[in-house]
């Protein structure tokens, strides 16, 4: 089963469909990961040992963009830990946004029955109201908790952990997108991990990436290239296909015009 993928999991149906379109040979389980029990996972894995698990939890709860709110998705890394404890892979890769490095565990006020106390706050711009949990204080950094739990998952399963912030623009992507990568190597293996070296040459710009796209006007949909690729990146992205998808312009209202 060298270089074969056992299964992938995704809750969002649209993301799952996109994954299946791009990776039709990989089994996609489109459901809540919490519903995947130990027996089901072991049955899908089979008898052979697992080499690698790649994943990450929803990034909204860790994002530095916008206002973070109380969100149980922030604790979904515990499901990742559960999968690791079942599959016991040689290596795992956990990825998330840079904001995860600054997020701390949050302690919420509770009533005498142990229920979280909420307060209603009004949005100054829209006037809409929303309930927020009342915060009593903050504790350790989430990243420290995650690294600690990954290092000692069970009494007989642990990983040597390394953590690094990488920027996609340093690896040939025309975008500044920083992400945290946590790599774990099982402690019983004599292996060392090194993160890839950043590209020293000129960074790929958006112009480098999409300057071969034809101009699209309002209420227009273009499905074919009208020019030759202008650099190696554009040739790579096209492959042997001259068809363009999702290259259209909608009809705008008066304010946008």
Model-derived segments and their meaning:
Residues 1-112, 117-120, 124:
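Core alpha/beta nucleotide-donor-binding catalytic domains of modification enzymes
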Residues 23, 28-31, 57, 95, ...:
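Residue-level signal for pocket-adjacent positions within structured domains
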Residues 33-37, 168-170, 217:
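Residue-level detector of flexible, active-site-proximal loop/helix-junction positions
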Residues 74-185:
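Conserved Class I SAM-dependent methyltransferase catalytic core
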């Amino acid at each position: 089963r060298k270089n074969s993928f056992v299964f992938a999991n995704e809750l969002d149906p649209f993301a799952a469909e996109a994954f299946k379109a791009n990776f039709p040979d990989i089994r996609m389980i489109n459901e809540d990961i919490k519903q995947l029990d130990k027996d089901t996972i072991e049955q899908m894995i089979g008898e052979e040992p697992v080499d690698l698990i790649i994943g990450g939890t929803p990034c909204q709860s860790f994002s530095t963009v916008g206002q973070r709110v109380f969100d149980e998705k922030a604790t979904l890394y515990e499901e990742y830990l559960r999968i690791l404890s079942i599959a016991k892979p040689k290596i795992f890769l956990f990825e998330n946004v840079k904001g995860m490095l600054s997020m701390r565990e949050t302690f919420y006020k509770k009533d005498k029955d142990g229920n979280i106390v909420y307060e209603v706050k009004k949005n100054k711009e829209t006037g809409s109201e929303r309930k927020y949990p009342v915060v009593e204080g903050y504790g350790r950094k989430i990243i420290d908790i995650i690294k600690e739990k990954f290092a000692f998952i069970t009494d007989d399963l642990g990983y040597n952990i390394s953590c690094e912030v990488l920027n996609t623009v340093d690896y040939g992507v025309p975008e500044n997108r920083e992400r945290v990568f946590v790599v774990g190597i099982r402690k019983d293996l004599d292996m060392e991990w090194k993160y890839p070296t950043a590209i020293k040459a000129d960074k790929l710009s958006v112009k480098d990436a999409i300057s071969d796209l034809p101009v699209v006007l309002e209420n227009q949909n273009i499905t074919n290239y009208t020019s030759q690729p202008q650099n190696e990146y554009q040739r790579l992205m096209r492959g042997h296909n001259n068809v363009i998808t999702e290259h259209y312009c909608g009809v705008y209202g008066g304010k946008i015009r």
